[in-house]
Design a protein with these regions (language model features):
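Non-transmembrane accessory domains of multi-pass membrane transporters/channels
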Residues: 1-49, 53-58, 96
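FNR/FR-type flavoprotein reductase catalytic core
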Residues: 53, 58-207
């Protein structure tokens, strides 16, 4: 497991390299032991051609059941989907903003680029998923933990706070993934901090 209610699953198969999956993309997954409905999950590790890894938080009965999926379960994967990839980058440097389990595609994206900065937002420290891996990769990560409802909490991820964390923010491409409300909040504030709309890339798992 990767944290409370969070589990990583590795899916192996033949000729997976032919799918040309890229870090930051997602698939629609069907686990045939019980799931006939597809669920979108991002790759949480850069694909190596022989396996994929996803990291899932228990947000409902289906995702909670993934922690009990037997080894050897057959899987149907449709994809890859999404443009939350390095190909969208217009400049040399990136800021990647993640909220909660939205860290999964960000974790896959940051394996090879030294100029990346990550801002990882959570209400509580135990909601920070894959923190050990991010630290082991040597990524420049700012963990922003706290509730907007407490005194001083309204400053978290404000334009001023973002510029304080990343002084060259306006010169970076910004990638955002997380809950819908957090995405909208972050996009509004990075725009206010001087980032052009064309340099903002969002993953909403839309098909």
């Amino acid at each position: 497991t990767e944290g409370p209610g969070v589990v990583s699953i590795r899916i192996a198969g033949l000729r997976l390299d032919r799918l040309h999956a890229r870090p930051g993309q997602f698939f629609q997954w069907r686990f045939l032991n019980r799931w006939w409905t597809a669920h979108p999950f991002s790759l949480s590790e850069a694909p190596d051609g022989s396996s994929f890894r996803i990291t899932v938080k228990a947000l409902g009965d289906d995702s909670a059941a993934l922690s009990r999926v037997p080894i050897g379960t057959r899987v149907i994967a449709e994809g890859p989907f999404g443009v939350f990839t390095d190909a969208m980058r217009r400049g040399r440097k990136r800021l990647l903003i993640a909220g909660g389990i939205g860290i999964t595609p960000v974790r896959a994206l940051v394996e090879h680029l030294a100029d990346d900065v990550v801002v990882y937002r959570a209400i509580r420290a135990d909601e920070l998923v894959l923190r050990g891996e991010l630290d082991a990769l040597g990524v420049d990560v700012h963990y922003v933990v706290g509730d907007h409802g407490v005194p001083g909490g309204d400053r978290l991820l404000s334009p001023e706070h973002l510029i304080e964390l990343v002084p060259d923010l306006a010169d970076r491409d910004v990638y955002v993934c997380g809950p819908p409300g957090m995405i909208d909040f972050a996009v509004k504030n990075v725009r206010a901090a001087g980032v052009h709309r064309r340099h903002i890339h969002v993953e909403r798992f839309a098909l």
